[in-house]
Structure formats: C-alpha cells, structure tokens
C-alpha cells in the first residue's frame, strides 16, 4: 500500500487525486503574493483540487550575477506568513543552507530541497531535524533510481514524511528531457511522487544570461505524468510570465491554468479509477 502523507486537511498519495503545488517562481512582494494566492485558492477550491502554495524568497542559483534573486529570507518569510494567515493554505518554500531550515520551518508546512542540492547531506539532515514534510527535487544529473540514496539519508536523519519530485534530466547542453519511467521508479520507494511540469521544460542557461524554456510543452508533459499516476503536480504560475523576474519562459499563464487543470483532473480520474 502506498504511503499517504497528511498535511492539514490534505492527503497526498500516488493513488489519491493529485495535489497541486503552485505559485510564482519567486516572491515579488506582498501585494503580488496575496493576489496570486487568492486566485489560486479560489480556482483550486472551485475545481476541488488540493492545493499548496509555493514561492521562493531567494533564487540562489540564477544563471547570471545580474539575475533577480528575490526578497531574501526575512522579508520573504514575512510575506509567506501573511499568505498563510490570509488564506489558511499550506505553504512550501525552498531552503539552500542548513542554517535556514529551522527559521523557515517556523512559517511553512513543507521544506523543499532544490535539485542542485539534493545530495547535500548536511542540508538534508537540517531539513529532517525540523520535523516538517521534506520535498526533494531530483537533481537533473541523477537517475531516478539514485534517489533511493537521498531517501535513505532523510530516513536515517528521522524524516517521516518525504516527497520526491521529478523535474527533468539533462539531455545534452541547455536542455532537459522527462523520462516518465522515473515517476514509477521513485514511487517504488513507497513515497509520494510529484511531477514538476514547469521546470521540466527549462532550457538551463539557454538564453545566455538566463534560463530559457518551452512553456508550450507544460500541459503535454503534465498530461503524461498524470497518465502514469502521481501524487501531485508542481506548476509555477504567473499572471504575466513574459515579464516575471525569473523562469518566465517556463511558467504557465494564470489565465490559462483553469483550462489546463480541468483537463488534467479528468486524466487523473481515469488513471486512478478503481
């Protein structure tokens, strides 16, 4: 029987209706965060889709030194706390160093380990020590079966609730490919698996000083993942992605999200019907 993780009133499991993890790539300010959260909460409530709000206080791995990194941990956590207070929705954000974990855990419901840092033992240990759910993104450089070692590290440090997220694999230069077998392989670890549909269309460093992407393939890959069967979908969303400070080429447009989610929910129901 597949493991089910409980978060507030949500249940996250590979055999359950998918949970949506969504929000803008980085926190741009309080007003923008509240606007995005309100729109996403209203939409997912209307469609009866379990929802977790995601946004980053620091984009620490930008391609260029000139790339916008975000509000930073202090102001960023203040914004996330306001979102949580206003809408009572679960929150996830990423951590980049061990000394951030305890502070971030005071505000959020789930800690996320970035793909580039997924093998950093000290970071995994610090995240596990918070007692929060830990979502680890599979490194673009790792095979899906290698995530068993990451999973074992977290378990050895006492983590009880672990999510693994597929976000594409390096395929030559400036390109990623999604191997849908990886979703099933990681699920064999008896842990909920998430598919990151927006970062999977990234073209890392593809614009020279920033990351490119192929937004037009987000829906296609999300359909494929839902057809395989996943516990959740991860989508970064923006009302004006072409003018977003980071990952604009990958993010799905807010005004297109309802149409996409409506389709995905139908696919999900077919995949998981008894």
From Swiss-Prot:
InterPro entries per record: Aldolase_TIM, DAHP1/KDSA, KDO8P_synthase
Pathway: Carbohydrate biosynthesis; 3-deoxy-D-manno-octulosonate biosynthesis; 3-deoxy-D-manno-octulosonate from D-ribulose 5-phosphate: step 2/3; Bacterial outer membrane biogenesis; lipopolysaccharide biosynthesis
Record key words, sorted: Cytoplasm, Lipopolysaccharide biosynthesis, Transferase
Superkingdom as given in the UniProt entry: Bacteria
Presence of the UniProt keyword Transferase in the record: yes
EC number(s) reported in the record: 2.5.1.55
Molecular function, one GO term: 3-deoxy-8-phosphooctulonate synthase activity
Subcellular location: Cytoplasm
Pfam families on file: DAHP_synth_1
Classification via PANTHER family: PHOSPHO-2-DEHYDRO-3-DEOXYHEPTONATE ALDOLASE (PTHR21057)
NCBIfam families in the record: KDO8P_synth, PRK05198.1
Record-given protein name: 2-dehydro-3-deoxyphosphooctonate aldolase
Protein encoded by which gene: kdsA
């Amino acid at each position: 029987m597949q493991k089910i993780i409980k978060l507030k009133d949500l249940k996250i499991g590979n055999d359950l209706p998918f949970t949506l993890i969504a929000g803008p790539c980085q926190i741009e300010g309080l007003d923008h965060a509240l606007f995005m959260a309100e729109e996403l909460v209203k939409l997912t409530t209307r469609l009866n889709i379990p929802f977790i709000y995601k946004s980053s206080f620091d984009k620490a791995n930008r391609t260029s030194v000139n790339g916008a990194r975000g509000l930073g941990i202090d102001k960023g956590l203040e914004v996330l706390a306001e979102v949580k207070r206003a809408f009572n929705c679960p929150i996830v954000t990423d951590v980049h160093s061990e000394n951030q974990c305890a502070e971030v855990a005071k505000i959020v419901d789930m800690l996320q380990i970035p793909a580039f840092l997924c093998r950093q033992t000290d970071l995994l240990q610090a995240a596990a020590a918070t007692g929060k759910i830990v979502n680890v993104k599979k490194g673009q450089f790792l095979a899906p079966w290698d995530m068993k070692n990451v999973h074992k590290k977290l378990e050895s440090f006492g983590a009880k609730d672990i999510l693994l997220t597929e976000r594409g694999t390096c395929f030559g230069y400036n390109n990623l490919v999604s191997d849908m077998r990886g979703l099933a392989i990681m699920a064999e670890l008896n842990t909920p698996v998430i598919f990151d549909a927006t970062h999977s269309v990234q073209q890392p460093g593809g614009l020279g000083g920033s990351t490119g992407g192929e937004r037009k393939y987000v829906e296609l890959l999300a359909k494929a993942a839902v057809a395989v069967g996943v516990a959740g979908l991860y989508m970064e969303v923006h009302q004006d992605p072409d003018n977003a400070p980071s990952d604009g080429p990958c993010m799905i447009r807010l005004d297109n999200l309802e149409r996409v989610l409506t389709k995905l929910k139908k696919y999900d129901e077919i995949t998981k019907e008894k």
